Curated annotation (Swiss-Prot):
This is Dynein intermediate chain 2, ciliary. Pfam families: WD40 (PF00400). Residues 1-11 have a biased composition (Low complexity). It is found in: Cytoplasm, Cytoskeleton, Cilium axoneme. Residues 189-206 have a biased composition (Polar residues). WD repeats lie at residues 380-420, 429-472, 490-533, 537-577, 580-620, 628-667. GO terms for biological process: cilium movement; outer dynein arm assembly. InterPro entries: Dynein_IC, WD40/YVTN_repeat-like_dom_sf, WD40_repeat_dom_sf, WD40_rpt. Gene3D superfamilies: YVTN repeat-like/Quinoprotein amine dehydrogenase. Residues 36-52, 152-176, 243-261 have a biased composition (Basic and acidic residues). GO terms for molecular function: dynein heavy chain binding; dynein light chain binding. SUPFAM superfamilies: WD40 repeat-like (SSF50978). Keywords: Cell projection, Cilium, Cytoplasm, Cytoskeleton, Dynein, Microtubule, Motor protein, Repeat, WD repeat. The lineage of its organism: Eukaryota, Metazoa, Echinodermata, Eleutherozoa, Echinozoa.
Amino acid sequence: MPVKSTKTKGGSTQGGSQAGGPSTLKVNKARVPAKGKKDDDDATEAGEHGGEEWMQTKSLIKPDDQLELNDQELKEEFTRILTANNPHAPQNIVRYSFKDCSFKQTSHVDQLAIHFSLDGNMIHKDSDEARRQQQRHGASEAISEQAISEAGEEKKEEDGEQKTEEPKEGEKRDEESTPAPAEAKSDQKLTNQFNFSERASQTYNNPYRERGTQTEPPPRANFSSTANQWEIYDAYMEDLEKQEKAKEKKAAPSKKDDDKSKKKLTALETQSDDMSRISHAAKIIERMVNQNTFDDVSQDFKYYEDMSDEFRDQEGTLLPLWKFSYDKSKRLAVTSVCWNPKYKDLFAVAHGSYDFMKQSRGMILFYTLKNPSFPEFVYPTDSGVMCIDIRPEHPYLICVGYCDGSVGVFNVTSTDANPVFQSTAKTGKHTDPVWQVAWQKDDLDNNLNFFSVSSDGRVVAWTLVKNELTYTDVIQLQLDSAPQDGPEGTQLTPLGCGTCFDFHKQTDYLFLVGTEEGKIHKCSKAYSSQFLDTFEAHHMAVYKVMWNHFHPKIFISCSADWSVKIWDHTYRNGPMFTFDLGSAVGDVAWAPYSSTVFAAVTADGKVHVFDLNLNKYEPICEQAVVQKKKTKLTHITFNPNFPIVLVGDDRGYVSSLKLSPNLRKVPKDKKGAALNHGPEAEIAKMDKLLALVREPPKDNKS
């Protein structure tokens, strides 16, 4: 008999046979001790041999060209750095920038590398799609069972009609054909819906088959017509009439109250529409009346040229044209004048007060040369407006600076007279009046931004983000004096008072800042704690600094110390030209048509026009343009297209003056032919003048 042996936990061996019997048990008992002894002997031998193998040394098998290293080389550590950069990612992607009209390299490259991606086709059993599949599967099973049952019944009917000779065999067949009683279905094991694994396999793709059919093409027709403004208008009006007739047919009869309310609403709507139409028509009629009233002035603006300039070689005149004023702004000084960069006949005027002991309201007015009698837009403000600037890319956006230290942005296209953005004490407004604001290029996120300078010693960059203004301090105008002792032993660094600034036309990061101490600081947007250079320019407050439109190194400044100075920011030995005008100079401006022509206004009511190419010492035009003696001129600006200037005074009036031919003379050669006119020619003309006044470099003696 076969013997079955098992080993217990204690190490003993038990035996047993498949068929029980005393003889069999005896045989097993006799065999057990012998087998156990043999196993013990085998274990002892295995233990001895295993110990010997453990004690024996094993020789390493290595190839002949194996590199042998000493202990120092083996202990040397190598640093392995794992990075998330994709080695196959391209490093030299170049894209075309439509904004800058040039190709630019893309610095940020996507480092994502996908090694394997598989979209699973498993769905949750409780989802809607799973329920729909179960319903479809159950319906198909029911249909198949019904078909099987119908086939069985038909077979039974046929067997009943036929006479069978062997009923027993028929009974057997019926018994065989009848299905067995369905057993109770066991509970189906449900899978864990949160623990599953996806499997994939390669299957044979079904070949594509092309099928085609012939159909009749849709009918086509050629038609042509002309489309212009009045035909489009007529078509819209016909469609509107059809819609109104359809509404009248569908409208049910209403009560008297509803009729009254509808009549009131329609009356209000028609009244508002009529007012808008009347206002537009009234504006056109007003311009027509002004054109007839000021026809002589319009003719002078367009065609008049002073013929007496032919007899005066180095002298010119200013022809007064229109005078702009508004009844509610007569007692407010003109604090800023700015031409619209898109609409050449439109300009903005800011009104405020330079008497800071009696601060009152302010006002922003928009005038046009087509209607000098009344402003186009009026924006009253609670605080005096000290400066204004219009964005070149969006001529409907105007940034302003107030006397209370806040800044704001107006949208001319909006019907609301309030600013769309305005800074508050929570958003970092200035603590002193804002003297100048200027739009700059969009930041890296394409957000609009502008800069402002104030008497609190801060130059701030304002960014328009969604519905709020965010500020960033660009630089603080710290003085060279030692820190002063503050309360509780603190040290206070005195700050200068900024009065004006101007950004370079070509170098985006470079700008100048003028102060009340008479200094001009050359600053950079990249350095917020250090000046690039400082010019000891004037003895009193600097009222204006402005870069030349053509020469990248030249800028001009004016001050309350009666002087106007022209500087080269790379020349440290002093100004290139200095002019004493005999009165406080309120504003100065370069001409947009020449690099050597500039104009300045003084507190005695005079306009001074200089052309360095004709006379380097005296103005070629000095003319009083105010009617009252005590009227002070505050600002002046050139029109970029027409030969006129705008001059504002402290009584709220803005005067337009036309330059005579001698004030905008084109340089000619010895034969009388006009020289090349362009940026390079203007730069060369200015360099020729600067070469005469620059000190020659000193030779270093070795």
